[in-house]
């Protein structure tokens, strides 16, 4: 299982910015092209890995969690909530400050309420900044985060709780898949 994901990671292009090796991958960057078979494989793996019977909503961060969350929502019938990078000024909107390995900014939560049971889905975890910010904000609202799952784990970021990943990678001159969890 996960053959398409592993192959696509191990053959993806690399670029270097400010001494940091970035891998360019359809799941994390949306380029060069996002193949439906890859999305289907990821969705099937997440459905197997997660206990979604206890989940009311799928929460994804804009932008690269959206396609993964959409696949999971279509496969399960669970509604998806997108944490946006733009403020809408809706009643109850919560601003979240996010710091990742490559950016800082605000994210905005809408449509999430105390007692909601959610799973957080994202493309990559490397520093854990997005996950920590979401966990903090969701906790303040009273949302129960049932689980967290990412497609690609780079390193071992500590986010203050357990999370699941489909693959774990090391990045040197190229991507090496060192573990797959499905």
From Swiss-Prot:
Named in its record, the pathway it takes part in is: Purine metabolism; IMP biosynthesis via salvage pathway; IMP from hypoxanthine: step 1/1
Domain of life the protein comes from: Archaea
Among the record's GO biological process terms, what is one?
IMP salvage
PROSITE patterns recorded:
PUR_PYR_PR_TRANSFER (PS00103)
* Gene Ontology molecular function, alphabetical: guanine phosphoribosyltransferase activity; hypoxanthine phosphoribosyltransferase activity
**The EC number(s) this enzyme carries:** 2.4.2.8
Task: Identify the GO cellular component terms for this protein.
Answer: cytoplasm
Alphabetically list the UniProt keywords. Answer: Cytoplasm, Glycosyltransferase, Purine salvage, Transferase
UniProt KW Glycosyltransferase keyword: yes
**Which Pfam families does the entry mention?**
Pribosyltran
CDD domains in UniProt = PRTases_typeI (cd06223)
**Subcellular location(s) of the protein:** Cytoplasm
InterPro entries associated with the record: HGPRTase-like, PRibTrfase_dom, PRTase-like, Pur/Pyrimidine_PRTase
Q: Which reaction does it catalyse?
A: IMP + diphosphate = hypoxanthine + 5-phospho-alpha-D-ribose 1-diphosphate; GMP + diphosphate = guanine + 5-phospho-alpha-D-ribose 1-diphosphate
- Chief subcellular location equals cytoplasm
Q: Name the family.
A: Belongs to the purine/pyrimidine phosphoribosyltransferase family. Archaeal HPRT subfamily.
**What does it do?**
Catalyzes a salvage reaction resulting in the formation of IMP that is energically less costly than de novo synthesis.
Q: Subunit comment for this entry?
A: Homodimer.
Please state what the protein is called.
Answer: Hypoxanthine/guanine phosphoribosyltransferase
